[in-house]
Amino acid sequence: MPGGVTVKDVNQQEFVKAFAAFLKKSGKLKLPEWVDLVKTAPHKELAPYDPDWFYLRAASTARHLYMRGGVGVGAMCKIYGGRKRRGTKPAKFRVCSRGVSRTVLQSLEGIKMVEKDAAGGRRLTSQGQRDLDRIAGQVATAMRKAQ
């Protein structure tokens, strides 16, 4: 970690892209069979266009757990929820697919990055926090070189 850079110190979009690339390159994250067929939420009309959307969702979830531990499946569904357009009726908020959120958290548990919290929800392990900080350091050095 150059200079003690943490996830909170870097641009979140650049970090999520870099961490998703790390997850894909490592090959440890187990992808479900239905990853190319599923819609991510009831308020979406189509499935994601990006074939690596599962890695991006896992990276975003890991970053959120870094910022606030003790978050469960229900809270993750609220975070990734959105506005459902219902035609002439007023729009309403809809949570995302619980199956997708649960599968992402279970996949992160499978690579020992997340563990269940005794108080409820899930939190990062020390290994997971170390990986996130290491990637944040790499993003920070890349951003410094780009300037």
Curated annotation (Swiss-Prot):
Belongs to the eukaryotic ribosomal protein eS19 family. GO terms for molecular function: RNA binding; structural constituent of ribosome. GO terms for cellular component: cytosolic small ribosomal subunit. The keyword Cell division does not apply. InterPro entries: Ribosomal_eS19, Ribosomal_eS19_CS, WH-like_DNA-bd_sf, WH_DNA-bd_sf. PANTHER family: 40S RIBOSOMAL PROTEIN S19. It comes from the Eukaryota. This is Small ribosomal subunit protein eS19. Transmembrane segments: none annotated. Keywords: Ribonucleoprotein, Ribosomal protein. SMART domains: Ribosomal_S19e.
